[in-house]
Amino acid sequence: MEEIRAWRHVFKLDPNKPIDDERLERLCESGTDAVIVGGTDGVTLDGVLDLLARIRRFSVPCALEVTDIEALTPGFDAYLIPMVLNSCRVDWVIGRHHEAVKQYGDVMNWDEIFAEGYCILNGECKAAKLTEANTALDDDDVVAYARLAEHLYKLPIFYLEYSGTYGNPSLVEKVKRALSRTQLVYGGGIMTPEQAAEMARYADTVVVGNAVYDSFESALATVEAVKRIDGENEISGVK
């Protein structure tokens, strides 16, 4: 978990979307802290294995975000398990997790497995529709989910997911202030270095996903943008 805590910038790659070898190499050697493999739909074992094999040519840490048990495979440095706290379906909070442990609990390496308390905030995204997430939340609702994740469920990660749209930095700041031990991850709509830097001022980890496919050069520039924020914080003494 200590290695994951050190992640400030992460690229998320969808095994259901194409990326050529040249771009993958540039991404993996960009200085990002890790690559997460994961997606909402169309995730297959073949797609995951292909992407894993290609990423493993490089030294960057690689994690699998498990959304479909049929696409689960050994070989990743870590396995991230989403628990959608604002889902209206128990399946996405604990049901699927129970089934996975029932099938594979005897062979699981729990040192490599980390639960993510997800709060999905873009009601129009695929993830919200699939999980039937209640996205009609005010700031107090979201902060309450963050506190539940840290204090009641003792989750190591709280993931604010805007999935395809850029979120509210002031809300991210409020959530960060409510957390002391749980790692705050922000994902959604980061298309420019400026947006990455803005969210990196508050979130422990920023995730860049769609920009890899829609605006590749801009996506690469987000790595340096986050590093600049860390440099500014180091100079000013901010942690």
Curated annotation (Swiss-Prot):
Keyword check for Lipid metabolism: yes
One GO MF term: heptaprenylglyceryl phosphate synthase activity
**Which one GO biological process term can you cite for this protein?**
glycerophospholipid biosynthetic process
SUPFAM superfamilies, per the entry: FMN-linked oxidoreductases
Give the EC number(s) under which this enzyme is classified: 2.5.1.n9
CDD domains hit by this protein? PcrB_like
One matching Pfam family: PcrB
Domain of life, per the record?
Bacteria
Function noted in UniProt: Prenyltransferase that catalyzes in vivo the transfer of the heptaprenyl moiety of heptaprenyl pyrophosphate (HepPP; 35 carbon atoms) to the C3 hydroxyl of sn-glycerol-1-phosphate (G1P), producing heptaprenylglyceryl phosphate (HepGP). This reaction is an ether-bond-formation step in the biosynthesis of archaea-type G1P-based membrane lipids found in Bacillales.
Question: Per the similarity annotation, which family is this?
Answer: Belongs to the GGGP/HepGP synthase family. Group I subfamily.
Assembly state and interactors? Homodimer.
The molecule here is called Heptaprenylglyceryl phosphate synthase
**UniProt source species:** Geobacillus thermodenitrificans (strain NG80-2)
Q: What is the lineage of its organism?
A: Bacteria, Bacillati, Bacillota, Bacilli, Bacillales
Which gene is annotated as encoding this protein in its UniProt record?
A: pcrB
